Amino acid sequence: MKKLIPAAFLLLAFVSCKKSTDNLQLTPISDYAPLTVGKYVTYNLDSLVYLNFGTIVAHHLYQVKYETTDSTTDGLGRKGFRITRYIRTLPSGSFSPDNTFLAVNTGTTFEFTENNLRFLKLVQPFEDGKTWKGNSAIDVSSLGSDLQYLYDWDYTYDSVGQPKQVGAFNLDNTVTINQRDDSFNLPVITSGPNETNIATRDYSQEVYAKDIGLVYKSFLHYEYQLAYHGYIGYGITLTMADHN
């Protein structure tokens, strides 16, 4: 009987671990990234740009609609969906298409390709503190690349399954992905013996809601250079305004 006890404990441990793993896998990627032709989300877009050689910050306001317009196949032969982005300058104006993207649900991940850059937006399991290299499929090391700031980002889940207010919407079930919050040599000092030579700031966060998809995005990337006492970079904020 004594010899059977270790085996029994091993069996219980195996069953316990299996149940724990199964529970973590219960939430499918499609819950937070539904891909159905005809589905759309409209956002208020605040676009930040630097003007006058980086000495002036300007904000441009638009509305954009991301609509799943067709199913397709990606370069790896996997089923994907074409996402068409439409834009207008006034809420009362007409939308005009201005870009297309590719979305792929692999069953365990959600990939989104824009401007030939493939981002690993979501992964299983949905668990607070879960981290992954969301930009690992992007070539940031080629000679002359201006994408080096995307290197080695750790995407991290936070507030999985929690309610959140986004714009005018009170959402019951969301997940926040903290993608980057990094700075170098800030604040910028523009005169004196300690004048800043170079400084950088990178911030990115996204929020997805169950049965809707992306509902909020905040992104900022800039670099300050003493050579021209100005900034290079851009930022965007997307806040959901409508969806079906």
Predicted regions and their residues:
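Positively charged n-region of N-terminal signal peptides that target proteins for export
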Residues: 1-4, 18-19
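Sec-dependent signal peptide hydrophobic core
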Residues: 5-9
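Conserved functional acidic sites
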Residues: 18-244
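C-terminal motif of bacterial Sec signal peptides marking the signal peptidase cleavage site
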Residues: 13-16
